[in-house]
């Protein structure tokens, strides 16, 4: 039996009742969630907790929050999985959780970890080495983004998630350092946009060729650029609407819908095409979060 106020949520979105029950039923004994089955991982656990919180569920989400709390690293970040001693970009997802539920001190340490993280190409050591080699920095390296793993280059996905976490914290408690990193991260995204709009996972050009955009990264970046009005964002929205009509990936459609919702550009009455199935627990959780966002409860920024 799923705890909390899930019946109220199910009346608002009839198709979600089974999804919520199924999601709760997939919880491991340790309190975490797997991607499909088996070992608990941080990413699916955070998405599951966010989805259950959006539905008003408290019992299983509470167990998930305790699992997350137990896996904090000494440096204030979170690993991809228990037993791994390196904090990763999944810390940004954890920082999206309400501090009053995660624990204010733990949440604050996660925010501090994000503020101290940047892609390797933005570090003083890297830039000095490039200068000594006579290599001029590329235009897409001017602003710092976030890497998947410390000590590596910045990518669009982790940068988008870090922006969301820091912007959410800045709305809660405005601070200059939060605002500065959010603004720099958004400039990073604009510089990394593909020539015809949208975003690839990383570089604008690779091996001498223009990079092509992907639907999931385009949706993530647009979500992180909520409130930004520019020609670049307008071009990206056009690409996102095209992707929405063409792609059949649950993950991609989840992020595209969230990205378009952030700019009030999701077509009225849009429904996911028949036959599109959630193949992982993060897919199912994100679909629930899209449904909640369409009803005014978006845990990515509220």
Regions found by a protein language model. Name each.
Residues 1-302:
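Preference for long, amphipathic alpha-helical scaffolds in soluble/luminal domains
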């Amino acid at each position: 039996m799923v705890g909390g106020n899930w019946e109220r949520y199910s009346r608002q979105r009839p198709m979600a009742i089974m999804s919520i029950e199924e999601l709760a039923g997939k919880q491991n004994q340790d309190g975490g969630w797997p991607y499909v089955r088996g070992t608990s991982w941080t990413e699916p656990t955070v998405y599951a907790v966010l989805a259950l919180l959006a539905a008003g569920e408290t019992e299983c989400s509470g167990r998930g929050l305790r699992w997350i709390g137990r896996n904090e690293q000494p440096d204030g970040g979170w690993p991809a999985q228990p037993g791994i001693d390196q904090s990763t970009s999944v810390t940004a997802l954890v920082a999206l959780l309400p501090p009053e539920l995660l624990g204010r001190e733990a949440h604050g340490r996660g925010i501090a970890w994000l503020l101290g993280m940047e892609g390797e190409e933005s570090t003083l050591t890297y830039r000095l080495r490039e200068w000594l080699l006579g290599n001029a920095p590329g235009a897409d390296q001017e602003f710092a983004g976030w890497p998947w793993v410390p000590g590596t280059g910045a990518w669009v996905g982790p940068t988008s998630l870090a922006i969301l976490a820091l912007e959410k914290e800045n709305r809660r408690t405005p601070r200059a350092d939060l605002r500065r990193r959010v603004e720099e991260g958004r400039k990073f995204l604009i510089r990394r946009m593909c020539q015809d709009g949208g975003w690839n996972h990383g570089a604008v050009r690779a091996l001498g060729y223009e990079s092509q955009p992907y639907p999931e990264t385009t949706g993530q970046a647009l979500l992180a650029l909520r409130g930004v009005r520019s020609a670049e964002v307008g071009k990206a929205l056009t690409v996102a609407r095209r992707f929405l009509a063409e792609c059949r990936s649950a993950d991609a459609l989840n992020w595209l819908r969230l990205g378009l919702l952030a700019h009030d550009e999701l077509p009225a009455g849009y429904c996911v095409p028949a036959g599109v199935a959630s193949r992982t627990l993060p897919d199912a959780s994100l679909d629930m979060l899209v449904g909640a966002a369409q009803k005014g409860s978006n845990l990515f920024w509220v």
